[in-house]
Curated annotation (Swiss-Prot):
Component of the A-type ATP synthase that produces ATP from ADP in the presence of a proton gradient across the membrane. GO terms for biological process: proton motive force-driven plasma membrane ATP synthesis. Its main location: membrane. GO terms for cellular component: plasma membrane; proton-transporting two-sector ATPase complex, catalytic domain. It is found in: Cell membrane. It comes from Thermoplasma volcanium (strain ATCC 51530 / DSM 4299 / JCM 9571 / NBRC 15438 / GSS1). This is A-type ATP synthase subunit E.
Amino acid sequence: MSLEQVIKEIEQSQEIKKKEILENTKNILDKMEAEKKAKIDEIRALYQEKMRAESSRITASIIDKANIEARSILRNKIEEILEGYVSAAQEILRNIRNMPEYPALLNKMIEVAKKYLGQDCIIKVDSKDKAVAPSSGITYSNIDPYGGILASSRDGKVELDLRVSSIMEEVLEKIKVKIYTRLEE
């Protein structure tokens, strides 16, 4: 083999090696680029998922705060409305003694007390009702500004509070409980 052929073979061999090196380098770079893109996509997907989760958490927090505020506003409005009704009821109760039905109502309260606590029960009627209450077995004192009776069994173990203001408070409390229970549903 001549020197020229040897040089030519070496050059060809070098060209082949160069092509192989370039091909390998290109393959490595392509692989690195693909890995880089995959990693970027993975990071992007992870970031998007975190953003969705954070967005959902923030949205839920905002909705919860809005619900709490709405309930508070609703409760305040209900309280305001109830106060209006209570004021109106108190105005009516201030004049209940002047109503023609009051003597019958008072006598009915006394009948109920005697029925449930016994004929010998102790009944207290407000002093202002002395004129409309039967006098036998009745004690008079300042028990309620609106009227009604307080009764107890002879031994004092059982009491019956039929004062007008107590009845009104009890009814109002029951109404509030029902309203607030419905609000929580």
